[in-house]
Amino acid sequence: MATGDLKRSLRNLEQVLRSLNYPREVDCVGLVKGDTAASLPIISYSLTSYSPYVAELLVDSNIELLAKNDLRFIDTVYKLLRDQFNYKPILTKKQFIQCGFAEWKIQIICDILNCVMKKHKELSSLEKTPSQQRKKTSSAKSEPCSSTEKTSTEPVGIDVTGRFVTSGKKKAVVIRHLYNEDGANIPEDTVTDVNEAFDVCDIKAAEITIPELQVPDINCEQEDITVNPEVTALQSMLAECQEKLKKLTCIESRLESLEEKMKGKVLVNEKTWANLLSRVTLLETEMLLSKKNDEYMQFNEMSEDYSSSSDMDSLNPDRKSKEERHANIPLSSGYSTVSSDSTPRTSTVNYCGLKEISEETTMQKMERMKKMFEETAELLKCPNH
């Protein structure tokens, strides 16, 4: 994009803003960069604050431009330009919001300002026509009254013959009447006619003063129109406040329902809950391991008892020989006693079987303990725990 085109478009914008009487400072750097923040204040001023007629048109068409973000503002402006001004911008909404397209954006701003000034002239001319008609009617009423006033203000004289004579080019109506020789007495009929003419003039003069009294009313209406944009802004703010209050009531009702649902419940953080679960699992494993250790200790004690008893039997051979002798001697009753060798043999056999069973159970217990230790190690390795 050439710099000359940008300078030309900026000059055009300055001229339009001068004709618009724009009171604020213009961000020329932002306009050259194509920043939307530099162009939006100009558009909002032209549509809301420049012309009371345009502001009234916005109110009649239920268009709100105040208290909106950039996207909604541009959306409403594009709709307003399409519906009320019959203007379609060159750029789309997305392109206008994006940074860039500086020359096109300046051209669109100039077009919008020209459209607003044109609409202002149209609406002001429409309001001027009824006021001009009122002035014409008032002037038409004042003309006959002024003519009657001129006729009445002219000096009237009474001729010797009893005629009313006015000084001037215009001749007054001559009223003939009879009079006595004693004095020229004017009859009552002529006096009443003249009084009626003056009364008519007074009525017309009063009618002329009525439109003069209506002029300050028109000025008051214009002042009301200038105040209307501020009133519309306040109305829009009130509407937004009402919407926010409705949302607050909805949020309060939801909070109350949540409080009723969450009565009697305890909220725990995920990390703390995971830590608690890991601790519980560790405690369970400790309990199991302690039980296994107790069982293993009891089993060792039992095996030690069995081994000590077997050693004691081996240390007493004399006792065994005596028992064998007693077994070889037949009893007098005829019954044969069971040999004493059977008891230690059976005890040794039972001891061997118990030893094998105990070894198997210990191996199984050790494997289970290994599995438990591995599971606890995996649980402790997890980062959440």
From Swiss-Prot:
Centriole-enriched microtubule-binding protein involved in centriole biogenesis. In collaboration with CEP295 and POC1B, is required for the centriole-to-centrosome conversion by ensuring the formation of bona fide centriole wall. Functions as a linker component that maintains centrosome cohesion. Associates with CROCC and regulates its stability and localization to the centrosome. Residues 316-327 have a biased composition (Basic and acidic residues). Disulfide bonds: none annotated. This is Centrosomal protein of 44 kDa. It is found in: Cytoplasm, Cytoskeleton, Microtubule organizing center, Centrosome; Cytoplasm, Cytoskeleton, Microtubule organizing center, Centrosome, Centriole; Cytoplasm, Cytoskeleton, Spindle pole; Midbody. Residues 126-154, 303-348 are annotated as: Disordered. It comes from Bos taurus. The modification Phosphothreonine is found at T343. The gene is CEP44. The modification Phosphoserine is found at S342. Residues 305-314, 332-342 have a biased composition (Low complexity). Residues 230-271, 358-381 form a coiled coil. PANTHER family: CENTROSOMAL PROTEIN OF 44 KDA. The keyword Phosphoprotein applies.
